[in-house]
Amino acid sequence: MVMLRSLLVSALAALAAGSPIAEPADQSLEARQLGSSNDLTNGACKDVTLIFARGSTEMGNMGTVIGPPLCSSLKSKLGADKVACQGVGGLYTGGLMQNALPQNTDPGAISTAKSLFEQASTKCPNTQIVAGGYSQGSAVIDNAVQQLSAEVKDKVKGVVFFGFTRNLQDKGQIPNYPKDNVKVFCAMGDLVCDGTLIVTAAHLTYTINAPEAASFLASKVQSA
């Protein structure tokens, strides 16, 4: 697996020209199981709506590394009947090559995420929106939030990033969005957070951060 990652990084480095890139999550059978949630698009409105974008090559629309654990932790803290979890699917394919684009993902992925924020605002006008992104998914959410109207952006109470691929470029925050409402998790040794193409084992460790991230989002919702 180490050799595979090295080959992928080497092959994409020339194309990326210094842009950070996320690599596949755990290749085990368990990690290949689908992880999806469509509480917003298919379910009833809840007090809180979590919109999450998975990392490159992760299955489903929530992935496996941190999406489902974050959803579960947030429901545990706020109540399962109070939280809707929605993964970003559609035009966001989680492909590796998209990491090399200027926004570290592609316009279709950003548009898909943006539409989910807007759907949450219109379908559920009283819901409080929170969001999260892992690896390439962090770039998806970062760019989507930047493009929201002031009205919708005001409903986004908190955002968490894991292995933030635009951490260096955007200085650990989302441009034109309150810095105090963003929490970035960068594991020690995760060089993706330093704006490099070097993917280490640390990039796959964010499952353990689910409770802390959920606590942060819950605190933003409760103080709103």
From Swiss-Prot:
Source organism of the structure: Aspergillus oryzae (strain ATCC 42149 / RIB 40)
Site feature: Transition state stabilizer:
56, 136
Protein name, as recorded: Probable cutinase 3
Matches recorded under SMART domains = Cutinase (SM01110)
Function in brief = Catalyzes the hydrolysis of complex carboxylic polyesters found in the cell wall of plants. Degrades cutin, a macromolecule that forms the structure of the plant cuticle.
Q: Which keywords, in A-to-Z order, does the entry hold?
A: Disulfide bond, Hydrolase, Secreted, Serine esterase, Signal
The EC number(s) given in the record are 3.1.1.74
Q: Secreted: present as a keyword of the record?
A: yes
Q: GO biological process annotations for this chain's record?
A: carbohydrate catabolic process
Write out the annotated subcellular location.
Secreted
Reactions accelerated catalytically:
cutin + H2O = cutin monomers
One Pfam family this sequence matches? Cutinase
Family stated for the protein in its record:
Belongs to the cutinase family.
